[in-house]
Amino acid sequence: MRILGLDFGSKTVGVAVSDELLITAQGVEIVRRKSPSKLRQTLARIEEIIAEYKVDRIVLGYPKNMNNTEGERCEKTKEFGDMLARRTGLEVIYWDERLTTVAADRSMMETGIRRENRKEFVDEIAAIFILQGYLDYLSNSRS
């Protein structure tokens, strides 16, 4: 059993996957969206990743505002998650992603990755943070 973690953005979707023991999250790739309004190719690529890694659940970052309200980005994310659930038949869990992009950017800065290169990886790293947060939650709830 593996879990897929996604960071859904207007231009890219960061993708991470858990190990089979559900302990760690690893980055897989960044799916580039050709057109923000057309999701077919994006969904098709994610379905390929689901099949390749034998995923049975999806954790999708949910971009609440800092004051815990839901804005337009939450609506778009929910629409994407609903499409994903319909197409794959898998459960989609919405996971609070506040500050994951900041944490991803900070971790890359600490490893010496230059600012212009960080943009390339921030969504994938954010997907890792989202999924790792969920995996840690699962681990703690089992203890």
UniProtKB/Swiss-Prot annotation:
The GO terms this record gives for MF are:
nuclease activity
Instruction: Output the lineage of the source organism.
Output: Bacteria, Bacillati, Bacillota, Clostridia, Lachnospirales
Recorded coiled-coil stretches:
none
Localization in the cell: Cytoplasm
Q: Which organism is it from?
A: Agathobacter rectalis (strain ATCC 33656 / DSM 3377 / JCM 17463 / KCTC 5835 / VPI 0990)
Q: Which GO terms describe its cellular component?
A: cytosol
Cite the entry's keywords alphabetically.
Cytoplasm, Hydrolase, Nuclease, Ribosome biogenesis
N-terminal signal peptide:
none
Its GO biological process annotations read: rRNA 5'-end processing
* Official protein name in the record: Putative pre-16S rRNA nuclease
Top class in the EC scheme: hydrolase
**Role description:** Could be a nuclease involved in processing of the 5'-end of pre-16S rRNA.
Does the keyword field hold Cytoplasm? yes
Name the InterPro entries on file: RNaseH-like_sf, YqgF, YqgF/RNaseH-like_dom, YqgF/RNaseH-like_dom_sf
Q: Name one Pfam family in it.
A: RuvX
Reply yes or no: does the keyword Metal-binding apply. no
What EC number(s) does this enzyme carry?
3.1.-.-
Q: Provide the family line.
A: Belongs to the YqgF nuclease family.
The protein's predominant localisation is cytoplasm
